[in-house]
Amino acid sequence: MAEPWFDELAELIRIPSVSADPGHAGDVRAAAEWLAEFVRRAGGAAEVVPTDTQPLIIGELAASNGSAPTVLVYGHVDVQPPDPLDLWESEPFSLEERDGWLYARGVADDKGQLYILLKAAADLAAAGELPVNVRVTCDAEEESGGHQIVDYLAADDRGADVAVIFDSGMTKQGVPEFNVGTRGLAYFHVVLRTGMRDLHSGVYGNAALNAMHALTETLAAVLPRDGVLPEPLREGIVPPTDEEIAGWAELVPGAELLSEAGARQAYQRAAEEFYLRTTAEPALDVHGIVGGSPVLQKTVLPVEAEANLSIRLAPGQDVETIAAAVERLLREAAPDGAELEVTRLSSSPPGLVPPDAPAVQLALDAFEKTFGRRPLLVRSGGTLPIVPALAEKGIPTIITGFALPESNIHSPNERLLAEYVPLGLETAGELYKRLGELDG
């Protein structure tokens, strides 16, 4: 491909920076070094900061002319494992263009999108026209659940006027979206014991506790009824605005998304209320249950059963309050005689971005100029810990991007529309120019 950015992006893509695999620790470090060197080549300062887990990339590209507002840029250079390799139609770490798409692991999540954001800043700096200070604050463990970037931001008192993250996408091609809310997450491991050992079902069945029965009874206390969680798990929800609700009508219908995913709706109105349920409401899911033996023909009462479950918190909810409510409901529902152990493995609060913030309005103007239409304001069903961390500092965050539902993020043949790279560069450049109007 003859585009001038292709070879440069291909260099970054070529580094197999899989943060979840200890065997790729050197590659993760190499990707971090690549990004720092990119900032330095653009005339900025940058360093790779080691941590207890994966490194951070911290740097700054100064505005071309004196005092200017500061834009914090976040992205991640680590990627998901490429497995299963036999399903890829090209080498996962070799950038390839075909049929109008760019294929490679990380091209959409998030190397390609982060590159667009930084390349646009570098081009403006080279022309002496960068109107903002670009503070690079990136990590290499987003795909493995790290928290170093959040800890770093908590300790950094410099502040910023706005943060920009290109690590998202749009539901429909040509219809950009800004995420103004992210859901939080609390993840639990539950162990339930009913005695000292497995028991003969012919001797003790219907008289002694069965750990599998007891666990399913316990879990039922926190599961939704017709898609609605128990009231203690709904406390604090900030409902979507009228503008957000109106925007859902422009998105791909929920029934279509469920069908394309090969999924079936869980409740009667689930498809109709897809965006409400997946972005603006809390959701609790059981991810795995272990107990007894589903393979061997054993006639026993299992003495122990385990489960993993998580709750996605809606914007506005307090993670400590909701996590405590989950544990309380589980303990109250456990049958008498059962021993229940509940361990919270991780948690992160939800985030809200004020859509009327001046920086957000300027960003909407920038996208409207390059896309020819104003972005929709939506919420993300996922969890992005950096958003509430920035909100704690009073920094509004612009979360957007160029991935599509068919970009195969986290799957074989990950891809990004090739035309979205030059469009993204133009849009990011316009974004910096508009944000330069902020009072620094």
Question: Where in the sequence are the language-model features?
Answer:
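Oligomerization/assembly interface segments of phage tail-like spikes and tubes
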Residues: 188-191, 303-311
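Acidic/His- and Gly-rich active-site-bordering loop/insert found
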Residues: 1-105, 124-130, 309
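Predominant activation on well-ordered alpha-helical scaffold segments within soluble catalytic domains
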Residues: 10, 36, 115-118, 122, ...
